[in-house]
Amino acid sequence: MSLNKTIYEGKAKVIIETEDSSTVIQYFKDDVTAFNKEKYEIIEGKGIINNHVSAFIMEKLEEAGISTHFINTLNEREQLVKKLKIIPLEVVVRNIAAGSFCKRFNIKEGEALTSPIIEFFYKNDDLADPMVNENHILYFGWLSHKEMEEVKTTTLKINKILVDLFSNANIYLVDLKLEFGKLINNSTKIILADEISPDNCRLWDKNTHKKLDKDVFRLNLGNLKEAYSEVAKRLSVKLD
């Protein structure tokens, strides 16, 4: 890991300062958590896989016209990214019923949704990331109405691109969690932040519905590293 000052450490990544005030280093850890940190393990090599998979996906999104914080990969665990003021929201888009969605609405896992459903959650571990609606978002000033529409439009575009990308790898994109931020030197520019990897996507094999994401860890379904490596392999992402 870089010897520069750590700005922030989360559950799966560390953000490290650089000499350029407009960029930071994003370091991918091997830590795996579930149920708001109630379940925890270190799985050697997990961070390396996520670094490469996320870089690959961010590059695909940039090619498709989506603005992201990704600049380039520095090494097996680190990326250079644009420094952002993170919007304190997790934006979840669902294509197939799974996880908490099934529990909240008593719906069977695996039911295809007629169209993608977007949900917002307030990023706050102490409050267990509560679900919020657009009125909450406006009241607390996290986004303006115009910005909210921009985030929703961008989210659906990202979802469409990734549904197709994973489908070509014989994988269903069940749902995914996105985060956005504003450039430090341009408070009106909202771009995609964080990562896109098996850590924050639900991914199922299209033939067997075998889980290839963090649910393998959550539900004790097998070897997490093997599942993540399978995703990388199907996307033709090189890990060395």
Curated annotation (Swiss-Prot):
<keyword id="KW-0547">Nucleotide-binding</keyword>
<keyword id="KW-0658">Purine biosynthesis</keyword>
<comment type="pathway">
    <text>Purine metabolism; IMP biosynthesis via de novo pathway; 5-amino-1-(5-phospho-D-ribosyl)imidazole-4-carboxamide from 5-amino-1-(5-phospho-D-ribosyl)imidazole-4-carboxylate: step 1/2.</text>
</comment>
<keyword id="KW-0067">ATP-binding</keyword>
<dbReference type="GO" id="GO:0009236">
    <property type="term" value="P:cobalamin biosynthetic process"/>
</dbReference>
<dbReference type="InterPro" id="IPR001636">
    <property type="entry name" value="SAICAR_synth"/>
</dbReference>
<keyword id="KW-0436">Ligase</keyword>
<dbReference type="InterPro" id="IPR028923">
    <property type="entry name" value="SAICAR_synt/ADE2_N"/>
</dbReference>
<dbReference type="GO" id="GO:0005524">
    <property type="term" value="F:ATP binding"/>
</dbReference>
<dbReference type="GO" id="GO:0006189">
    <property type="term" value="P:'de novo' IMP biosynthetic process"/>
</dbReference>
<dbReference type="InterPro" id="IPR033934">
    <property type="entry name" value="SAICAR_synt_PurC"/>
</dbReference>
<dbReference type="InterPro" id="IPR018236">
    <property type="entry name" value="SAICAR_synthetase_CS"/>
</dbReference>
<dbReference type="Pfam" id="PF01259">
    <property type="entry name" value="SAICAR_synt"/>
</dbReference>
<comment type="similarity">
    <text>Belongs to the SAICAR synthetase family.</text>
</comment>
<dbReference type="InterPro" id="IPR050089">
    <property type="entry name" value="SAICAR_synthetase"/>
</dbReference>
<dbReference type="GO" id="GO:0004639">
    <property type="term" value="F:phosphoribosylaminoimidazolesuccinocarboxamide synthase activity"/>
</dbReference>
<protein>
    <recommendedName>
        <fullName>Phosphoribosylaminoimidazole-succinocarboxamide synthase</fullName>
        <ecNumber>6.3.2.6</ecNumber>
    </recommendedName>
</protein>
<dbReference type="GO" id="GO:0005829">
    <property type="term" value="C:cytosol"/>
</dbReference>
